[in-house]
Amino acid sequence: MKQVQLSAASWDTPGKAHQALAKALEFPEYYGHNLDALYDCLRDLRDVQLVIEDCAKASEQMEKWSGFLSVFFDAASENPYLQIKLLPGNGDYGD
């Protein structure tokens, strides 16, 4: 399983979050940079563990963070080949 690790510390707008996710997860060029498109792309990933650190910082800075959380939860629930770990800070918090 491929692990993709990101820090959400600089995600103060939805656009920055979408850009970082699209680049790290190699989304197609037609990726729409919205929550529906994020869900679709996450649902289609295979054998990926996405680890996002500094989620507490993103939740403080970004008004729409709860929408991203919903998409992460829904996509991981729908896609058995995708694991998503959301860590409040930076570092290894175990499994």
Write out the residue ranges for each language-model feature.
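Positively charged, polar, low-complexity stretches
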Residues: 1-95
